[in-house]
């Protein structure tokens, strides 16, 4: 008997330990991790991050946001660098998107926000209302009003929905949950130019794509795009719960005293993990290596799977990769697990690969070999 709600479809396996890019179950079986806990443990199970959190455990764990926090300032500086932003820390991606929605509406005095079909921004009410998937929203009664949904990568569809009451657009650089669908470069350029012309704020949801996943600190750096607001989570704490919302400094007036807040957001344990994570991630060599390994993974998957009739396409950016197939991908996930490889699905028919950024070429080759045999 379980004491838990049955809202997850749990596999009959429990991981109890880990070693860098490998997971270990309670029977001591070892698995190669191509999931990173759904894009969370981007640096694997990293001893430098462990040590940073351990050191903080020996100091203060939590203090409310009524007092100064030098570690919040330090992590914010690493996230922002020379960019013109301010930071707000929270506990998750959905909370970061809630903050972004509130900031956009308050700063502009407008209520409409354009999102995209097949998007995913979270499961709390505002973020859920911005999600363009009926299976996520339809069971819970009326959603938050003011959201419109354009076709992803279709500029005319987006433009047709704008009005004098449009506060912002919220967009994922790569639609992860719907099948690893990257944004088109021309579309992003057109969207950026139009929004700047019409004073429409651009909110970029980097919850899954950020913190080095695509070979850049932020995935929008691959495009001609200048976001007004950026949301982050997942890989930021490398396994500890943390989210962040970055907003342009000229929006700072809208988030003054009492406008928004959180009890646990910016707590020192999660910030200790984020601080060390960013110290490692903000390394040009590491990010270049992610791009190189991502190219290696995509090219070799394409070569290995070229004659597989049930493979439609291999796509992705950096180490965020999707294999679109004609059959149910959950069957591949089960067989991969049996052979010692942990992978994910996305959308209806996509195998999603999110290996740690620290994965080795040898481990990538092993994963490709297993996938080729199964598919």
From Swiss-Prot:
An example Gene Ontology CC term for this record: cytoplasm
Cofactor: record remark: Binds 1 pyridoxal phosphate per subunit.
Major localisation: cytoplasm
Binding site for N(2)-acetyl-L-ornithine: 123, 262
Biological-process GO terms, alphabetical: L-arginine biosynthetic process
Compartment(s): Cytoplasm
Cofactor: pyridoxal 5'-phosphate
Catalytic reaction equation(s): N(2)-acetyl-L-ornithine + 2-oxoglutarate = N-acetyl-L-glutamate 5-semialdehyde + L-glutamate
Modified-residue entries (N6-(pyridoxal phosphate)lysine), positions: 234
Binding site for pyridoxal 5'-phosphate: 93-94, 120, 205-208, 263
Identification of the protein by name: Acetylornithine aminotransferase
The organism's taxonomic lineage, starting at the top: Bacteria, Bacillati, Bacillota, Bacilli, Bacillales
